[in-house]
């Protein structure tokens, strides 16, 4: 069911922007957090707070395969509960799995970290994008 947009079924598409921290690479579909300088870094398992999801930079003709690097202007959304977005998975997941925040901006079905959402499809690629309903 993967498509060509990260925001699949979002009630309000209020886009936000911030700079990517130097030395960091962020892919569309990664979960991100903001550091003390309000620059984007990859979310880790211990991260808490808003579920910020990196978007593709469609305004510049970029797609899901075009990454942001340090100094780039990152476009992201904070989806609401019930919104459907594509997120990157850390390992294989099944449809209906409860997904949690993991390292490197990805989600997975194990552990006790903050619940991000429910997998709406199965995924087998370690770097794959799947549709997720936000919790």
Short names for language-model regions:
Residues 1-135:
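Surface-exposed, low-hydrophobicity beta-strand/loop segments enriched in small/polar/acidic residues
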């Amino acid at each position: 069911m993967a498509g060509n947009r990260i925001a699949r079924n979002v009630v309000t598409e209020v886009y936000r922007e911030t700079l990517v921290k130097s030395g960091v690479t962020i892919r569309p579909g990664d979960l991100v957090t903001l550091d003390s300088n309000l620059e984007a870094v990859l979310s880790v398992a211990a991260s808490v707070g808003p579920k910020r999801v990196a978007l593709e930079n469609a305004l510049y003709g970029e797609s899901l395969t075009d990454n942001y690097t340090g100094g780039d202007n990152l476009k992201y959304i904070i989806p609401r509960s019930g919104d459907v977005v594509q997120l990157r998975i850390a390992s294989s997941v099944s449809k209906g799995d409860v997904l949690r925040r993991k390292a490197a901006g990805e989600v997975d079905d194990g552990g006790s970290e903050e619940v991000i959402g429910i997998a709406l499809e199965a995924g087998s690629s370690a770097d794959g994008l799947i549709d997720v309903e936000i919790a």
